């Protein structure tokens, strides 16, 4: 296909036009008075969402040049979501503001590379200030406040998430399910999570995660190599039951993996393969733990079992399994007594061990097996409401985890606004053109609060000015008042604020230093 090449100002303008479209679509959701966005779905009812990264993923423009800009700014949202799990809209708004301001400086003759250096140095300084300012949290009320805010000021959801973290701990597993009623409910159940995801992305045919309901589980410490001997017996058995299958094995060779993917894509059986976690004896022990949890058996030569002669009673079972790129969560209902007995056995091993390393490994196994999984069954009057609530809950869980990890700062965009003057003063020691880069970041810091106020029907510039002149206060958009944000419980996780700022600066710097763009010519163009 022939290409179209754009240079300098023309290239940057085309990128900027695409970014304007995406930023506006995402920014309308920011803050407590943010609006919803309706997404058309080809084969189901439209989805109503308030989640920045979900909206960003849906935007695909016909104009290739503008769409390149969309893809670039989408990265700021995606990367923030990947690392912090929330703050995607803030990252998009910040990146857009930096790019708009930066393009003005570039058009007036500023050196883009010097601007990039200044922006990078300014962001490093801001990150260190945010870390110093962050207040650690651990109490029930603070956790509830973070979760409530991120879920759209829903106190009931905040209380539920706070209870879930109390039950399973800061590192525990909280799983979201679509409920069967209009009420959202919390349930603590048997379960485990380990840090291994699907072997091939072809297992994830919709989105980044695969969910299996009521699946069978094959556990083996061997490498699955031969299709006929190792795979066909278990695939034949499970396909007759019309249930899904999770394979946890040492590895799956190319030919066997291709067979699994083909069966999955053809709809013959819903199957996912995952590499077993750990190494050596620890791998065997973890597989045994999973076998106890799911009521199955580990297929090993030592036990005299083989994949050729497998039967259904050797397979484990679970209520639900979620597999992502780098994790697998097993939610099981039964086998409480067996799990309890296994935990006692691990405790005895821990007491007998003299090795600090072995004790640490046993402690990790015990935590995985005993803490269980908090399952939040998301309810809603309609399917659209349920899906929107599920996205909000996911954001709230991630935000709460981030707050526990790195602490909290004042929310509502006020923390960033209060850093504008100190940043400009700090930047005076930089070179003149690097100072312009720091100014780009400083001017963009007001963008989230400006948008929150605008979405609440207020004059954004006026609100920003008032907050900037009152160091201890911020703007409560839900009640249209100026308050001490932390005392009022309007707080943001420091990690979310930090990641949004870092990723926005990274994308903005890349755009400002772009001098040429090469895109496909639309069909029909000569």
Swiss-Prot record:
It catalyses: ATP + H2O + a folded polypeptide = ADP + phosphate + an unfolded polypeptide. One of its GO terms (molecular function) is unfolded protein binding. It is found in: Plastid, Chloroplast. Gene3D superfamilies: GroEL, GroEL-like equatorial domain, TCP-1-like chaperonin intermediate domain. Its EC number is 5.6.1.7. GO terms for cellular component: chloroplast. Keywords: ATP-binding, Chaperone, Chloroplast, Isomerase, Nucleotide-binding, Plastid. NCBIfam families: GroEL (TIGR02348), PRK00013.1 (NF000592), PRK12849.1 (NF009487), PRK12850.1 (NF009488), PRK12851.1 (NF009489). Together with its co-chaperonin GroES, plays an essential role in assisting protein folding. The GroEL-GroES system forms a nano-cage that allows encapsulation of the non-native substrate proteins and provides a physical environment optimized to promote and accelerate protein folding. PANTHER family: 60 KDA HEAT SHOCK PROTEIN, MITOCHONDRIAL. This is Chaperonin GroEL, chloroplastic. It comes from Cyanidioschyzon merolae (strain NIES-3377 / 10D).
């Amino acid at each position: 296909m022939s290409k179209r090449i754009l240079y300098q100002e023309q290239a940057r303008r085309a990128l900027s036009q695409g970014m304007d479209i995406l930023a506006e679509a995402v920014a309308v959701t920011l803050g407590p008075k943010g609006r919803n966005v309706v997404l058309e779905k080809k084969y189901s009812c439209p989805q109503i969402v308030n989640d920045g990264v979900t909206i960003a993923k849906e935007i695909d423009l016909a104009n290739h040049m503008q769409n390149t800009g969309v893809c670039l700014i989408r990265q700021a949202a995606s990367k923030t979501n990947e690392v912090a799990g929330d703050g995607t809209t803030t990252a998009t708004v910040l990146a857009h503001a930096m790019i708009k301001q930066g393009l003005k400086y570039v058009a007036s003759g500023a050196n883009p590379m010097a601007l990039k250096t200044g922006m990078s140095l300014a962001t490093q300084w801001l990150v260190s200030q945010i870390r110093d300012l962050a207040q650690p949290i651990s109490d029930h009320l603070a956790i509830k406040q973070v979760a409530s805010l991120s879920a759209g000021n829903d106190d009931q959801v905040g209380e539920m998430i706070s209870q879930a973290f109390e039950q399973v701990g800061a590192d525990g597993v909280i799983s979201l399910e679509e409920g069967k009623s209009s009420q959202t409910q919390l349930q603590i159940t048997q379960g485990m999570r380990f840090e291994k995801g699907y072997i091939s992305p072809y297992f994830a045919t919709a989105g980044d995660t695969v969910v299996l309901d009521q699946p069978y589980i094959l556990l083996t410490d061997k490498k699955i190599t031969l299709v006929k001997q190792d795979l066909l017996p278990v695939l034949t058995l499970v396909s007759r039951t019309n249930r899904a299958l999770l394979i946890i094995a040492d590895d799956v060779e190319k030919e066997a993996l291709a067979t699994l993917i083909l069966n999955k894509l053809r709809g013959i059986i819903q199957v996912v393969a995952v590499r077993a976690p750990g190494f050596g004896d620890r791998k065997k022990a973890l597989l045994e733990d999973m076998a106890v949890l799911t009521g199955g058996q580990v297929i090993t030569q030592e036990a005299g079992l083989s994949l050729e002669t497998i039967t259904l009673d050797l397979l484990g079972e679970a209520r639900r399994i979620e597999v992502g790129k780098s994790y697998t969560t097993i939610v099981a209902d039964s086998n409480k007594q067996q799990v309890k007995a296994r935990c006692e056995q691990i405790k005895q091993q821990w007491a007998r061990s003299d090795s600090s390393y072995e004790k640490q490994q046993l402690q990790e196994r015990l935590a995985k097996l005993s803490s269980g999984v908090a399952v939040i069954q998301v309810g809603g009057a309609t399917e659209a409401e349920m899906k929107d609530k599920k996205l909000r809950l996911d954001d709230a869980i991630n935000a709460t985890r981030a707050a526990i990890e790195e602490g909290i700062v004042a929310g509502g965009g006020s923390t960033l606004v209060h850093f504008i003057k100190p940043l400009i003063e700090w930047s005076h020691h930089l070179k003149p053109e690097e100072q312009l880069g720091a100014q780009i970041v400083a001017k963009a810091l007001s963008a989230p609060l400006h948008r929150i106020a605008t979405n609440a029907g207020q004059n954004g510039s006026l609100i920003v000015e008032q907050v900037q002149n009152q160091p201890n206060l911020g703007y409560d958009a839900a009640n249209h008042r100026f308050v001490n944000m932390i005392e009022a419980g309007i707080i943001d996780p420091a990690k979310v604020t930090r990641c949004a700022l870092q990723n926005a600066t990274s994308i903005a710097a890349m755009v400002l230093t772009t001098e040429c763009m090469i895109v496909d010519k639309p069909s029909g163009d000569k």
